[in-house]
Structures are given as C-alpha cells and as structure tokens.
C-alpha cells in the first residue's frame, strides 16, 4: 500500500509541475485536474494505510 502512496505522490507532483509551471501550455487544465485527482488518491491511500495498521 505504501508503494501506491509513493506512486500517487510522484504522479501528483509531476502533474502539478506541468499544470502550474506553465510548461504544459494548452494542456495545463488537464494537468491541474490530474494533479487534484492523484492528490485525492494519495490522501485516500494514506488513510487506508493508517486504518490497516491500527
């Protein structure tokens, strides 16, 4: 489960860098959507991991 958390974090950071940094140009909106989507998946994975350990 921690593996997925790290994968989602990396993908969210990359999508955020592309979306907010202006590198993506025309697809900045898509990058922002992906950023928040994977950020939500990261939070869900962290919560699920914490619940399983408890």
Swiss-Prot record:
Pfam families: DUF1328. Coiled coil: none annotated. GO terms for cellular component: plasma membrane. It comes from the Bacteria. It is a multi-pass membrane protein. It is found in: Cell membrane. Its main location: membrane. The chain crosses the membrane at residues 5-25, 29-48. Keywords: Cell membrane, Membrane, Transmembrane, Transmembrane helix. NCBIfam families: PRK13682.1-3. Belongs to the UPF0391 family. This is UPF0391 membrane protein BMEI0373. It comes from Brucella melitensis biotype 1 (strain ATCC 23456 / CCUG 17765 / NCTC 10094 / 16M).
